[in-house]
Every structure is written in C-alpha cells, then in structure tokens.
Amino acid sequence: MSNPSPQVPEEEASTSVCRPKSSMASTSRRQRRERRFRRYLSAGRLVRAQALLQRHPGLDVDAGQPPPLHRACARHDAPALCLLLRLGADPAHQDRHGDTALHAAARQGPDAYTDFFLPLLSRCPSAMGIKNKDGETPGQILGWGPPWDSAEEEEDDASKEREWRQKLQGELEDEWQEVMGRFEGDASHETQEPESFSAWSDRLAREHAQKYQQQQREAEGSCRPPRAEGSSQSWRQQEEEQRLFRERARAKEEELRESRARRAQEALGDREPKPTRAGPREEHPRGAGRGSLWRFGDVPWPCPGGGDPEAMAAALVARGPPLEEQGALRRYLRVQQVRWHPDRFLQRFRSQIETWELGRVMGAVTALSQALNRHAEALK
C-alpha cells in the first residue's frame, strides 16, 4: 500500500497565494492615487487634490520625481505650494539630484523669494544647511556666500569677547583704584569684602570730618580764639566742606557710571539690542514700551532707518580702522560680514520682525552683506 501524500488545507493555500497579490494590489492602488494627486496639483484642481488626500490619508505627498514641492516652485504655483505645506509636505525632502524645495525656490530668482522661499524657510529653517550633490546650499544659490557660523568662528568670536571684557574690567579696576587713592590717607586699611560706592563715599566723608575735628582741637589747644565766635565759624566751615565733598562724590559717581555705560556700549558695538540699553526701540517710539515686533525702520541698521546698502556698508567701513592698517581693517570687515550675514541675521532676529516686513528686511540685509563682501574683496 502506498502512503497518501500530505494534503495542504485549502484555506492555508489560498491565504499564502492571496497575501502577496493583495499587498501588490494595495501598493499599485496607492501609487495610482499618488499620481492622480500630482495630476490634480498640476492642473490647478486643488480642491480635488485635498479631497483625495482626505479620503486616503496614507498617501505620500512628497512622492514623485521631481517631488510636488519642487514642481510648485518651478511652475511658480504659490497656491499649490501653500496647500502642500498645509498637508504636511517636507521642505527638506530631496530629489534625485539632492536638491530640496529651498534649492528649487532659490533657482527661481528674486521674484520667488517672498512667495516661495520665505514660506519654505519658515516651515523648515534647518533645510538651509542641506547641500545637494554639487555641494551647494540654498543660501549659496542665492549668492549669500558661505555661512560663517562654523565652530571655529564661534570659538574665535567667544575668545575675542572674553578678551575684550577682561581688558574692560582691568581698565575699570585701575580707574577705581586711582579714584580711591586720592582720598585714602592710611595705606594699611584693609577691607574684608568689596564695599559699594555709596558706602565708600560715606566712609570718606566721616574720616574727613574726624580729621578736620582733630585738627581743630589741636589748633584750639595751641592758640585759643574767642570761644563763641570761633566755634560757630568752625561749624559753618565744617558743614560747608562736608557739603562740597558730598557734591564732589556724587559728581564722581555719576562720571564713573557714565564711563562704565559708554565703555560697555563700545564693547558691545552693533550687537543685539537689549531692553536696558539704548537701541532701535528708543530711536523709534512706536516700538517702545509695548513689546511690539520690529518694522523695517526698527532694525538696528548702520544708518538710521536703513537706506542704500552701499551707503550702509560705507558707514560700517568708516567706523573701522584706517585704510593704512590693512590687517586690522580686514579683521573688522570679517566681523561685520559675520554680523550681517543673512543666515546669521535670520537666526537671531527672525522672531522679532513683523512677518509682512520680513521679505523687505531680508532683501536689505542680503544687499548689505553683498556690499560688505565687495569691500572685503577690494582689500585682497
């Protein structure tokens, strides 16, 4: 008798055959729907495209070559771009050439800057650092030049800042010691902890009064003038001298305070304006006291209110070292290039600028950066 061959159950066999077919059919349907979604976008039928994605939320809005965001930038289709961003399209998605949507928008020229480049940049600022296969970033395509935000530059700026602050602190301490040396009579006086300026001035006033009283007593012991007249005159003279001393101490305190503020302002230069310092919010009253965002005129331009980029660049150069000192002038221009580089400026001040003014401000910053680059090239 022959053994009967093992039989595979019908349900198991049908399941093993249907699974790959079902998966392939599902993938094919999804790809057809994604192609239909892209056709709707190309034809301008945005309502149908949105409805299709709502019925089938699993579709990939970035699928296709080139991706839909790249197509919208190339066709200058701003409504399609806004719809894709609202539906979750990724501006950092790269095509087969390594380009992101920001690369595609940057290649469309200045006309596409406000409607295409800025919305993509606002959605994904980190995409500015992505390079394509040619090694280009979106900023380099726009002509912004290489960014100066490398780790070495950051460390160099930090070391220069620390060096300047140490130098400033040393000068202030020297000036403080010089002022104290004018009034101290006893060099052996020691303090356990630093005393404030007001306590120091009060102590000097008391010591001066005690010294004067001692001199008066010694003078009275050697030659005794008439008691009533001499006593009243000495008190009047003592009060007058104490009053003059307090006035001089207050004047010196005000002078020191102004000197510290002036040196600190010179040390900070054109850094980010702080609420406690004079800045664009004091120059433009409409932005002060109510925490409003900056407009174009509120930005701390080199020239008040902005203006011609060449004029602003010339003003910055005029504030630096003389032309005879080529090395110092080049270092100064390098610092200004870092400060007014569009990438750096956007990272630091984007949250403080009105959205509808951002395009105009960044256009002026870009032009100023290019003018500074030309000045730096002229020194080579």
From Swiss-Prot:
GO terms for cellular component: nucleus. One of its GO terms (biological process) is cellular response to lipopolysaccharide. SUPFAM superfamilies: Ankyrin repeat. Residues 1-34, 131-166, 185-293 are annotated as: Disordered. PANTHER family: I-KAPPA-B-LIKE PROTEIN IKBL, NF-KAPPA-B INHIBITOR-LIKE PROTEIN 1. Interacts with CACTIN (via N-terminal domain); the interaction occurs in a pro-inflammatory-independent manner. ANK repeats lie at residues 64-93, 97-133. It comes from Pan troglodytes. This is NF-kappa-B inhibitor-like protein 1. Residues 237-286 have a biased composition (Basic and acidic residues). Involved in the regulation of innate immune response. Acts as negative regulator of Toll-like receptor and interferon-regulatory factor (IRF) signaling pathways. Contributes to the negative regulation of transcriptional activation of NF-kappa-B target genes in response to endogenous pro-inflammatory stimuli. Keywords: ANK repeat, Nucleus, Phosphoprotein, Repeat. The modification Phosphoserine is found at S150.
